Amino acid sequence: MNGIINLKKEAGMTSHDAVFKLRKILGTKKIGHGGTLDPDVVGVLPIAVGKATRMVEFMQDEGKVYEGEITLGYSTTTEDASGEVVAETPVLSPLDEKLVDEAIASLTGPITQIPPMYSAVKVNGRKLYEYARAGQEVKRPERQVTIYQFERTSPISYEGQLARFTFRVKCSKGTYIRTLSVDLGEKLGYAAHMSHLTRTSAAGMRLGDALTLEQIAERVAEEDYSFLQPLELGIGDLLKVELSDEQVEDVRNGRFISLVSDEAELAGFYGEKLVTILEKRKDQFKPRKVFL
């Protein structure tokens, strides 16, 4: 069994939980996912099955799209709605929407983030959330991410001393939308957190086409495996090249191939089928992953 699944992960489960349940449903252990989603987040979780597990790193490289809500007025330990309140800055007067949009625009392009303490990033061999649960705070490594698009998608609404609005973000892998929400609040002079989030697109797959675990289980019971999409979907933004019969034979035997390209990696096709991921070595390409 090989292929890629567009899974709709529902709230209340980790990405690992989803993989564990799919292994039982599909009766195979060779399953991985293409990008972690926090337990409270609903949305597209790309799943790789069989040979497709070798495509996970390329699936993760593609940009992701999120829709969510930011609340100004208080921040939390986890930077989302599930954490305990750590700071409050009441919103006592209406915000200037133009200034809000300017602050949002200032957070587009390449930016630096510090991962939240409640995250799976490892420091000295331990995950940050393990330190956080033990009441310890450690120095967290900065990371460079890219925000391709960040826009407000609703008017600002007010409730008591809080302000809320929805947003849409297209970003690179490794981006923490929780942290982006907190950073925006800081630019506006308010404690803030991400109060809701949905991932609407990842690895070229859209939420409107995604299936829940329950829907997949129903199809498997009917021996309908049409939800398994081809490996070719997982190449992400890699440039496609058509290989000759002779080059395919070289790939089969692990030999270098002469190709003219400035790309560091290429997706080698034979007809409509992906046969290899090629890696540049000086003026030639070496088969890095082979699917023959």
Swiss-Prot record:
It comes from Streptococcus gordonii (strain Challis / ATCC 35105 / BCRC 15272 / CH1 / DL1 / V288). One of its GO terms (biological process) is mRNA pseudouridine synthesis. It is an enzyme of class 5 (isomerase). It catalyses: uridine(55) in tRNA = pseudouridine(55) in tRNA. CDD domains: PseudoU_synth_EcTruB (cd02573). SUPFAM superfamilies: Pseudouridine synthase. It comes from the Bacteria. Gene3D superfamilies: Pseudouridine synthase. The active site is at residue 38. GO terms for molecular function: RNA binding; tRNA pseudouridine(55) synthase activity. Responsible for synthesis of pseudouridine from uracil-55 in the psi GC loop of transfer RNAs. Keywords: Isomerase, tRNA processing. Pfam families: TruB_C_2, TruB_N. Belongs to the pseudouridine synthase TruB family. Type 1 subfamily. This is tRNA pseudouridine synthase B. The keyword RNA-binding does not apply. Its EC number is 5.4.99.25.
